[in-house]
Amino acid sequence: MTQAAPETLPLPPSSTEAIQRFCDALWLEDGLARNTLDAYRRDLTLYAQWLAGRGKALDQTEDVDLSDYFAARHEDSLASTANRRRTVFKRFFQWALREHLVSADPTRLLSTAKQPPRVPKTLSEAQVEALIAAPDVDAPLGLRDRAMIELMYASGLRVSEIVALKTVEVGLNEGVVRVIGGKGGKDRLVPFGAEAGDWLRRYLRDGRTALLGERTADALFVTARGDGMTRQAFWYLIKRYAQRADIHAPLSPHTLRHAFATHLLNHGADLRVVQMLLGHADISTTQIYTHVARERLRTLHAQHHPRG
């Protein structure tokens, strides 16, 4: 005999409406992905249901309610999960304050839970080479994809930066790209190597012109319709080529950026140089990659040292 699920208290209409309006605003203003919006809605709904047990709606939240809620959820939450909820609640109540749904922000005293630094997943150099070689360069789209992957691995650009690149921002003769308005609104110059430069030239000569036909575009990397690439499209390509290259390692949209940083450090690059290339404001962000490099060195030592 199965046990009945505990009864869930119905949400006050004002809470349901506020959550929906907030998610609509995020979709319109920030263009957040559906999965992200669903996670935000789920976190807020769970809290609103818990709060309904106290006879309150979301707009009646007080500091003590949030403190009690996080204390109640502490035992079943990772620090990263708790921090995500804090971020969601802060955004929601800051929005609610702007919309005059609340008179004060009850999240102002919420502290961040400590969590260990997340070591980014990366690929070996052999795996990157296999990924780079996966596109069919006899086709215009394959040329585009090869040039994109070459450039990302050669420069460490963020996905959002590489899809936003304009043709005029690439200096082929100088071997640099100019990133306009990167993370934090900062511009920077990032070098790339001769191999990436050769593939960019080939793409511009044979691939981009074939994709555009009689059309014109500012974007460096274009689709078959002549539009600029999107982050989602690039991520789809990386997953497809990883499958073609028989790569089963965990991937993310920034896999090549992580590989760029880790492989530079493995080959003795200075941490400050890598920080500048990645566009990190704080070197502690870059230091995460040293954990990957150290683990790789330990593995090599264990495999190849006679007393490993």
Curated annotation (Swiss-Prot):
Record's keyword annotation contains Cytoplasm: yes
A GO molecular function held by the record: DNA binding
GO biological process: cell division; chromosome segregation; DNA transposition
Keywords: Cell cycle, Cell division, Chromosome partition, Cytoplasm, DNA integration, DNA recombination, DNA-binding
Pfam family, any one: Phage_integrase
Active-site residues per Swiss-Prot or TrEMBL entry: 158, 183, 254, 257, 280, 289
Subcellular location as annotated: Cytoplasm
Cell division found in the keyword field: yes
Gene3D superfamilies, A to Z: 1.10.150.130, Intergrase catalytic core
Assigned GO CC terms: cytoplasm
CDD domains xrefs: INT_XerDC_C
Occurrences of domain Tyr recombinase (ranges): 118-302
Every Core-binding (CB) domain range: 13-97
Taxonomic superkingdom: Bacteria
Family, per entry: Belongs to the 'phage' integrase family. XerD subfamily.
Complex formation: Forms a cyclic heterotetrameric complex composed of two molecules of XerC and two molecules of XerD.
Function of the molecule: Site-specific tyrosine recombinase, which acts by catalyzing the cutting and rejoining of the recombining DNA molecules. The XerC-XerD complex is essential to convert dimers of the bacterial chromosome into monomers to permit their segregation at cell division. It also contributes to the segregational stability of plasmids.
Protein name listed in UniProt: Tyrosine recombinase XerD
